[in-house]
Amino acid sequence: MIQSNLNMEKQDLLICSNLKPNQLPKLLDEALSVAAEGETRDMLLLSLLTNCAYALPAMRMLHGRPHHIYSPELLTMIVAPAASGKGIMNYGRLLLQAIEGNTGKKVYIPANSSASALLKMMDKYDGRGVVFATEMDTLTQTLRAAYGQFGDIVRCIFEHETVSQLRRQNNEFIEIRNPRIAMLLSGTPNQVAPLLRNRENGLMSRFACYVVNSRMEFDDQVWDTATEGDTPYEAVLYDRLASELGDRYLWMEEARHECYFYLSDTQLETIRRMFRSEYDVYSKEFGDLFDASLKRMPVIMKRIGMILAGLRLDMTKPLPERVICSDEDFQTMLLIGHKLLMHAA
């Protein structure tokens, strides 16, 4: 991130606190009930969105000229000091447990892998999966050793471009076409520093970045109040939500066709106006260094909109071949995109 001189209060940077009641799809709304307000709730929301993308295998969108086809996988980066509540993001991982259990497919790719091992796992998982790390210690060592190779993989993943590697030692060739990998990485500023060392290569502009600037306040509800034999409310809730999401995954898989996400003409014009305005503000503050983040944020925003729309589709009906973004989800993706831009600065 660039050190910003913009005068922003903490409240200005929050996402969930600025959402209206019931603005999110029901599954996300319920899943967020385990988190307190403020940054903790925001971190959980970004984890939920990143993980839910895997459960929407049929969703697609077009972007750019000429049109490029994108699926909903997000690359998300949370930067936070120690003891700031990053562990809340592990709840997002629970949402995919039913998919793993019902299909026998492995979803998660270990983040503590070398770049070569990461490619092997992607190949083994048929180019689909989630790289998940709430503490980046081991990955940081990988980045220091093979930053260029990791950066190349991330750049290809963002655009779903073919990733390939030839290992000279055993003449092994790996090629992964149309990779659809989501990433949720988090760590302290020192842990993520290797990713930030070269702003000009555009690597960080491919991530939805969220920065926590303060430690958690002490919570006087941390004491154990459960009686022996109780099943925690959170476990029961996430078991049910995981089952619902697993059903949605199978519904899309069985449809055997894709569902394209579109914005209305009015929504497209609103985004154009928003980014013209944002471009003027951030260009004056940061010059050309922020260009890549501004130009890639519309893709990230539309991916978020695609996830929201996919979670709202009625599973009692056949999967549609196209869906127009609702005004409700459009306002949500605009808000999240705007806040993420502020954090990227």
Q: What do the PLM-derived regions correspond to, one by one?
A:
Residues M1-A345:
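Phosphate-handling catalytic cores of nucleic-acid transaction enzymes
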